[in-house]
């Protein structure tokens, strides 16, 4: 019984780690994608990045 619980907990931890790494990779891709759409405009300050993301969101909704 103890081995089964240990196995289930280890599987759960592995699944959580894999999901975390997938989210990190998705965030890296998103930054690169924004840099390709708005070259030179989104990298200067935080407000510009926010405006570029909002503009991109408006384009996808339209």
UniProtKB/Swiss-Prot annotation:
Cystine crosslinks: 42-52
Entry's transmembrane regions: none
UniProtKB keywords: Disulfide bond, Secreted, Self-incompatibility, Signal
Record localization: Secreted
Principal location class: secreted
GO biological process: rejection of self pollen; signal transduction
Extent of the signal sequence: 1-26
Pfam families found in the cross-reference section: SCRL
Gene Ontology CC terms, in alphabetical order: extracellular region
InterPro entries the record matches: SCRL (IPR010682)
Physiological role: Truncated and inactivated form of SCRA, a protein involved in male-mediated self-incompatibility when active. Most A.thaliana cultivars contain such an inactive form and thus, are self-fertiles.
Family: Belongs to the DEFL family.
Note: By contrast to A.lyrata and A.halleri, self-incompatible species with full-length SCRA isoforms, A.thaliana is self-compatible with impaired SCRA protein.
Name of the molecule in the record: Defensin-like protein A
